[in-house]
């Protein structure tokens, strides 16, 4: 994929963020960062299949920058916040919000983790991960964890 039309600022920003992530990942075992970056490059290169190649490439860069900022805690965060779901204290979701563009959160449930991106919502806030979602509206929190899973009603712990 040609990245010539890509704003140089995105390429420079990714290089800066990747370098910061490398510093934090120095003791990772096994080393995931480089492998993930190679996978990201392959995905970005698949943008040639897209109807709008430049939009695909730009979105790919923006998402990768945010993923690195979030997963390696390179930006300001608020939380963690604990939520009890379906009235069961053992059914807990822990959420940390990150000041990224777009906004993100990491939700943890048991030994699973989901990076979610903020999506447009008519009201309240809505975050979507691969197979998970987190919706806050007027004090009510709805979480879906896993493809086709039932919606859980959650309450933030004081």
Regions found by a protein language model. Name each.
Residues 3-6:
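Short, small-residue-biased leader/transition segments that mark boundaries at the very start
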Residues 18, 62, 66-158:
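Cysteine-centric segments in proteins
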Residues 23-38, 42, 49-55:
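Surface-exposed, polar/charged faces of alpha-helical domains
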